């Protein structure tokens, strides 16, 4: 920084101290300017909070949001183009219904109904994904751009204006001790910054119909989603009612127990409900503990030496996305990195990946 720049910073700091501590009066801005500044501040707060609440509305599960953010970050680091999407609750419910519907089979009324409902839930999840994309493009992104560009630019102008005001007030207070030309230049710069800040705030407030248009796009996307959701659920309701009518019109099958077989109670080995029992092996003194010379070892995964960062799995973890590391309860995992407060990166049997911190107990922590 040049000598002139250092002097200017000293002037501003000196004036600020005299106003805050000494109670000195600074140049007052007009009421219209203050009113615009207040409206811009309220607009900035409104846009910031509405953005956060809209994301919560579209993706209500905070754990899933955090996991998705982490996976997207990892995908960018690895140069992967396709990022995993948010796991819609309708899709998870649909997969559950379809899985159990297939297990029950086609002869089960409930199984067939679960398959119908599961397919409809998956369609609802697809419609919800479309809502997410539509709202992001036409509502979230424009508001985020407003925050990052227009509002940020206004804050820059206001900060610059405050700095020039302090410089002008300091020099005005020392009038007669500094050249008149220097005081005149300070006043011109202050007036110039005030005009620039005023113009940018006026433009933002006068064009707020753009935000109304973006809000309208949000409502249109919601309406389209709910129309499609109602159509899908109406179709599902008709299918289930038709299944109920068909089931009630079919004759009921009566249960006919199979005839009991005659039980032969002559042999004690077959006295266990008619089923033959396996003969118990005889234990002799010569053979009963002979095998204890070589204890039986259960197969286990290779364990890393405990002098390096590692952890023990408390529960089974099934990976749902690329890059995650699956393991079973009791596995010992080598720790290589901590992604954030919720996720570790580690290795098991030569495989590397990410896994949640809450699923493991740290044995040897990572170096700080």
Curated annotation (Swiss-Prot):
Q: How does it sit in the membrane?
A: Peripheral membrane protein
Region called Membrane-binding amphipathic helix, residue ranges: 1-21
A GO biological process held by the record: endocytosis
The SH3 domain sits at 306-365
Q: Where is the composition biased (Basic and acidic residues)?
A: 245-263
Subcellular location per the Swiss-Prot or TrEMBL entry = Cytoplasm; Early endosome membrane; Cell projection, Podosome
Domain (BAR) ranges:
18-249
**UniProt xrefs under InterPro entries:** AH/BAR_dom_sf, BAR_dom, Endophilin_A_SH3, Endophilin_SH3RF, SH3-like_dom_sf, SH3_domain
GO molecular function, a single term: lipid binding
Modification sites for Phosphotyrosine: 315
Specify where the region named Interaction with ARC lies, as residue ranges. 218-254
The entry's keywords? Cell junction, Cell projection, Coiled coil, Cytoplasm, Endocytosis, Endosome, Lipid-binding, Membrane, Phosphoprotein, SH3 domain
User: Coiled-coil segments, which residues?
Assistant: 181-250
Q: Which residues carry this modification: Phosphoserine?
A: 288, 292
What cystine linkages occur within this chain? none
User: What is the purpose of this protein?
Assistant: Implicated in endocytosis. May recruit other proteins to membranes with high curvature.
What is said about its interaction partners and assembly? Interacts with ARC, SYNJ1 and DNM1. Interacts with PDCD6IP. Interacts with BIN2.
Spell out the family assignment given in the record's similarity comment.
Belongs to the endophilin family.
- Name assigned to this protein: Endophilin-A2
The organism of origin for this protein: Bos taurus (Bovine)
* Phylogenetic lineage: Eukaryota, Metazoa, Chordata, Craniata, Vertebrata
Q: Which gene encodes it?
A: SH3GL1
């Amino acid at each position: 920084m040049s000598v002139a720049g250092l002097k200017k910073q000293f002037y501003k700091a000196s004036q600020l101290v005299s106003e805050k501590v000494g109670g000195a009066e600074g140049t007052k801005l007009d009421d219209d300017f203050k009113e615009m500044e207040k409206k811009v501040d309220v607009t900035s707060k409104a846009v910031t909070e509405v953005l956060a609440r809209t994301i919560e509305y579209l993706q209500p599960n905070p754990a899933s949001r955090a996991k998705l953010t982490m996976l997207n970050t990892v995908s960018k680091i690895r140069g992967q183009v396709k990022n995993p999407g948010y796991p819609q609750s309708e899709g998870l419910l649909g997969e559950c219904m379809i899985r159990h519907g297939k297990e029950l089979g086609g002869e089960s009324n409930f199984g067939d109904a679960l398959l119908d409902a599961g397919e409809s839930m998956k369609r609802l999840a697809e419609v919800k994904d479309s809502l997410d994309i539509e709202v992001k493009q036409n509502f979230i992104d424009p508001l985020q751009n407003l925050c990052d560009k227009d509002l940020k630019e206004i804050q820059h102008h206001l900060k610059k204006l405050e700095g020039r005001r302090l410089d002008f007030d300091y020099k005005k207070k020392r009038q007669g001790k500094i050249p008149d030309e220097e005081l005149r230049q300070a006043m011109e710069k202050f007036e110039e910054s005030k005009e620039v800040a005023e113009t940018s705030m006026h433009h933002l407030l006068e064009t707020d119909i753009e935000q109304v248009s973006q809000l309208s796009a949000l409502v249109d996307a919601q309406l389209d989603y709910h129309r499609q959701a109602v159509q899908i659920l109406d179709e599902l309701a008709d299918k289930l009612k038709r299944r109920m009518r068909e089931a009630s019109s079919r004759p009921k099958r009566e249960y006919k127990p199979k005839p009991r077989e005659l039980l032969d109670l002559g042999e004690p080995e077959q006295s266990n409900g008619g089923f033959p029992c396996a003969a118990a092996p005889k234990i002799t003194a010569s053979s009963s503990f002979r095998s204890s010379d070589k204890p039986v070892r259960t197969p286990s995964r290779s364990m890393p030496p405990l002098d390096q960062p590692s952890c023990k799995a408390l529960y089974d973890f099934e990976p749902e996305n690329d890059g995650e590391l699956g393991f079973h309860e009791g596995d010992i995992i080598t720790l290589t990195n901590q992604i954030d407060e919720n996720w570790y990166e580690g290795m098991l049997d030569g495989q590397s990946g990410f896994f949640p911190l809450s699923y493991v107990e740290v044995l040897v922590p990572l170096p700080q």
